[in-house]
Amino acid sequence: LIPKENLVAGSLVFNEDFDRENLRTDYPSWEYQAWKYQKGADWRHPTGPDSSIEGKMDHPVVNVVYRDCLEYCKWAGKRLPTEAEWEYASRGGKEGQKYNWGNEFQPDGKYMTNSWQGTFPTDRQNLDGFLDSSPVKSFPPNGYGLYDMSGNVWEWVNDYYRPDYYNFSPKRNPQGPTASFDPGEPTIEKRVTRGGSFLCNSNNCTGYRNAARMRSDVSSAAYHTGFRCVIDTKMVKK
C-alpha cells in the first residue's frame, strides 16, 4: 500500500549531476549493435521463434505493447499506474535521492539492480550474474517493499509522452498530458516507460534513476520492456 501524498515526476532535466557528454555515441553504427528487429519474437518467445519462457515464470513478462498491458490490466481488474504514481512508488519514501536505495550506485560494492556492467554496447562483463532479465526478488526491495523498480526491464505507464508536460502539469497527482507529442517523431503515438533495464548503464541511459523517463512507440514491443499493474485502494475497501 503506497501512502497518498503529492505525486511529482521528474526527468534528466532535474538531475544536475547528469552529464550528457557521458552518453557515448562514437561507436560505429552503435545503435544497430544494440537493437535488431527479430521476426517471430513475442511474449512467449522473447528473443525469437526458437526461444521460450520455460524456466522464466518468475521473470517479468516482456515483448508486450502498450495495449497488451491495458487488456491484461482490464482482465485482472487493475490498471497501469500513471507516471507520477510510478515514480512515487519507485522512490520508496526516499525523496531527493538518485536511486530508490540511496545516492550511491553500488553501496559497499553491492549490486542493487539488474543493469549492464561494462561499456555499452561493446563490453558486457555480467558482474551481477544476469545477461538479460532476472527473476523477481533477485535484488533488494525498496522502502515500500517493491522489487525491480530500478533496472531489470522498462515498465509501461499510462501517460502519453510529452517532454514539457511537467512545466505546466498539476503539482499534485498529475495524470499525464491529453495527447502524445515527441518533437523528433510528432506523428507517432508514444507513452512513457520507466525504470530502466538490464541494458542501462552509466554511459548509456542511466534509466535506473528514480527520475529517469523514456518514450516508447505504443505499437513497439521489446525484450527489455514489460509492465506492472496497480489497484486503487477504493477498489479493495469493503
Regions found by a protein language model. Name each.
Residues Y223-V236:
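Short, structured beta-strand segments at or near domain termini in extracellular proteins/domains
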Residues I2-N210, M214, V218, Y223, ...:
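Functional-site microenvironments in short loops/helix caps that host divalent-cation chemistry
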